[in-house]
Structure formats: C-alpha cells, structure tokens
C-alpha cells in the first residue's frame, strides 16, 4: 500500500511540474525548428567538405607512394 502511495505521489508531482513548463507558441516553435534545421544543414556541409578533402588527400598520398 505504501508503494502505491509513492507511485501516486510521483505522478501528482509530474502533473504539477507540467503546469510550470513554458510551452512555446507556434511562431517560436517554427523559428527554433528553422534554426535547428539550418544548423544541421551547415554542419552537414562542413562534414561533407572535410570528408571529401581527407579522401582526396589520402588518395594523393597513396598514389605518390606507388
């Protein structure tokens, strides 16, 4: 019985905390999403360029050694 009370108390506290959460409006949510998508795109391009460069450098070094 004590265990059931602890579970009940836990979920009551969770419910209380959800009322304290700041929920963004649609405009803020869209702006944040665009920032995340743009950041991921930029870092993906950086990784692509670095990967391509390292690949070409390694190919050059391997062909020089032959």
From Swiss-Prot:
Subunit structure: Component of the Sec protein translocase complex. Heterotrimer consisting of SecY, SecE and SecG subunits. The heterotrimers can form oligomers, although 1 heterotrimer is thought to be able to translocate proteins. Interacts with the ribosome. Interacts with SecDF, and other proteins may be involved. Interacts with SecA.
Primary role: Essential subunit of the Sec protein translocation channel SecYEG. Clamps together the 2 halves of SecY. May contact the channel plug during translocation.
Keyword Transport tagged: yes
Positions of transmembrane segments: 29-49
GO molecular function, one term: protein transmembrane transporter activity
Gene: secE
Compartments, record wording: Cell inner membrane
Biological process terms in GO annotation: intracellular protein transmembrane transport; protein secretion; protein targeting; protein transport by the Sec complex
Mode of membrane association: Single-pass membrane protein
Family matches, as PANTHER family: PROTEIN TRANSLOCASE SUBUNIT SECE (PTHR33910:SF1)
Predominant location category: membrane
GO cellular component, one term: plasma membrane
Disulfide bond residue pairs: none
Gene3D superfamilies: Preprotein translocase secy subunit
InterPro entries reported in the protein's UniProt record: SecE_bac, SecE_sf, Translocase_SecE/Sec61-g
Annotated organism of origin: Rickettsia prowazekii (strain Madrid E)
Keyword Hydrolase included in the entry's annotation: no
Protein's UniProt name: Protein translocase subunit SecE
Span of the signal peptide: none
Keywords: Cell inner membrane, Cell membrane, Membrane, Protein transport, Translocation, Transmembrane, Transmembrane helix, Transport
